[in-house]
Amino acid sequence: MTGLAIRNISMRFDLPNGGSVQALQDVSLDIKQGEIMSVLGPSGCGKTTLLNIVAGFLAPTDGVIELNGHEVHGPNAERGMVFQKGALFEWMSVRENVSFGPRMKGERASDYSANVDHLLDVVGLQDFKEKAIYELSGGMQQRVALARCLANDPDVILMDEPLGALDALTREKMQSLVLKLWKETGKTIILITHSVEEALLLGERLIVMAPRPGRIHKEYRLPFADEGVDADLREVKKNPKFAEVREEILGMIWDMEEEIMGRTEASA
């Protein structure tokens, strides 16, 4: 399989006053199958817009998305989405949520049950499978969301700030789980985050986007995701290279934010 191709994507939103906003301009990326890539940038750089175009929720103004050599039109089961809030069915049990996709596709329970149980084991929720969603903590709910996404067996997993609302310790545990699932499943993962450290930990490839219009500013190839599969993430962060790249990116984004503020003040 050839993976995911983002070809010259531009996105313009028309405004009620007759004007428009250029959210993305000529974004191109080739993402190989099994790659984990993080996308980072200041607010307004088009990160989520790009993810929604890849998911098929938005049609770009220009450009195309191709998955395994076929042009993407609208959402389908080949691309799974995990949101900041799990978008789970609170009245259903954990197991019912995880098995929702296969059930909606008309699969027989005998065909999907073993995989659902395996996924519940992987995310550490087998003992909670009969619990209702509202009985779970935020971190546990995000584990359910991950398992539900994987139960549909997508080629690509799209994650829009899925760990942003979690406390620091739970977030670190979830970061380790994401890396474990990446290695175990071989899925392509694209993760949007506002956290520089998270982007470094969860991206063997890291894309920094610049705003107005949203575009690729810089790309990094990093060893930390591979290291984090087997190592304690706190130890990974002690790598001098980790600190060096973190400071470089923080400075880069700071400068972008300063430029945005300058533009805003000049137009006021």
Curated annotation (Swiss-Prot):
Organism lineage reads as: Bacteria, Pseudomonadati, Pseudomonadota, Alphaproteobacteria, Rhodobacterales
What topology does it adopt in the membrane?
Peripheral membrane protein
Q: Which Gene3D superfamilies match?
A: P-loop containing nucleotide triphosphate hydrolases
What cellular component GO annotations does this protein have?
plasma membrane
Indicate which residues the UniProt annotation says bind ATP.
G41, P42, S43, G44, C45, G46, K47, T48
- Protein's job: Part of the ABC transporter complex TauABC involved in taurine import. Responsible for energy coupling to the transport system.
Q: In the Enzyme Commission scheme, what number(s) does this protein have?
A: 7.6.2.7
User: Is Cell membrane tagged as a keyword?
Assistant: yes
Q: Name the domain of life this protein comes from.
A: Bacteria
The chain positions of domain ABC transporter read 4-236
PROSITE patterns linked to this entry? ABC_TRANSPORTER_1, ABC_TRANSPORTER_2, TAUB
The family annotation for this protein states: Belongs to the ABC transporter superfamily. Taurine importer (TC 3.A.1.17.1) family.
Q: Tell me, how does this one assemble?
A: The complex is composed of two ATP-binding proteins (TauB), two transmembrane proteins (TauC) and a solute-binding protein (TauA).
Instruction: Give GO MF terms, alphabetically.
Output: ABC-type taurine transporter transporter activity; ATP binding; ATP hydrolysis activity
Which Pfam families does its entry note? Answer: ABC_tran
Give compartment(s): Cell inner membrane
CDD domains with a match to the protein in the record:
ABC_NrtD_SsuB_transporters
> What PANTHER family would the database entry show?
TAURINE IMPORT ATP-BINDING PROTEIN TAUB (PTHR42788:SF18), TAURINE IMPORT ATP-BINDING PROTEIN-RELATED (PTHR42788)
Keyword annotations for this protein, in alphabetical order, are: ATP-binding, Cell inner membrane, Cell membrane, Membrane, Nucleotide-binding, Translocase, Transport
Presence of the UniProt keyword Ribonucleoprotein in the record: no
Q: Which reaction does it catalyse?
A: taurine(out) + ATP + H2O = taurine(in) + ADP + phosphate + H(+)
User: Per its record, how is this protein called by name?
Assistant: Taurine import ATP-binding protein TauB
